[in-house]
Amino acid sequence: MQVELLNDQGLASSKVDVPDTVFGREYNESLIHQVVVAFQANARQGTRAQKDREQVRHSTKKPFKQKGTGRARAGMTSSPLWRGGGRIFPNMPDENFTQKINKKMYRAGMASIFSQLAREGRLAVVDSLAVDSPKTKVLADKFKAMNLNSVLVIADVVDENLYLASRNLVNILVVEPRYADPVSLVHYKKVLVTKAAMDQLKEMFA
């Protein structure tokens, strides 16, 4: 498999060979879906909470007499049928959303995503994206010159300058290979990988 090598203007200067073990896999939609859903589920904190009829603060006084009003009988205003009452099946803060996915499936899913990105032309290689100063404008101008407005950058090393220069850019995410995740790969329109990061990706997902 070959992908484009981009210059500083975002133009393809040549093509580089990338390992088929990571970038030449078949597209496995069901596996990719499973990996993405599991990653999102495992990122949930599970701290949302609602109150049931016992936890709602309310008066125990009967709202109105049992008979003679023509209305349905009611015992407490905390009933789920009443406005401000408790939920019938509330979400509890100890709910666990964890989904287990083994390492072999995760690696295969990530490789399938990388392969599809390469086939669609959404994956490219750059020599380096190092910046000399932690100024956002420097990196923003570089991406503007490359005509990129939604990009995930996988760099071999994210130093302080690159981190500070990129953290305020909208729709730009710069990560090291170990922090690349399936959701970000699917989300961004373009994925740039430095040459040095390619070797790390090969070791991780081959």
Curated annotation (Swiss-Prot):
Q: Which UniProt keywords apply?
A: Ribonucleoprotein, Ribosomal protein, RNA-binding, rRNA-binding
Say if the entry is tagged with keyword Ribonucleoprotein: yes
Task: Give the record's GO CC terms.
Answer: ribonucleoprotein complex; ribosome
Q: Which Gene3D superfamilies match?
A: 3.40.1370.10
**Signal peptide span:** none
Q: Which InterPro entries match?
A: Ribosomal_uL4 (IPR002136), Ribosomal_uL4-like (IPR013005), Ribosomal_uL4_dom_sf (IPR023574)
The annotated region (Disordered) lies at 46-77
Stated role: One of the primary rRNA binding proteins, this protein initially binds near the 5'-end of the 23S rRNA. It is important during the early stages of 50S assembly. It makes multiple contacts with different domains of the 23S rRNA in the assembled 50S subunit and ribosome. Forms part of the polypeptide exit tunnel.
Assembly and partners are described as: Part of the 50S ribosomal subunit.
Recorded protein name is Large ribosomal subunit protein uL4
State the taxonomy lineage. Bacteria, Pseudomonadati, Pseudomonadota, Betaproteobacteria, Burkholderiales
What gene, per UniProt, encodes this protein? rplD
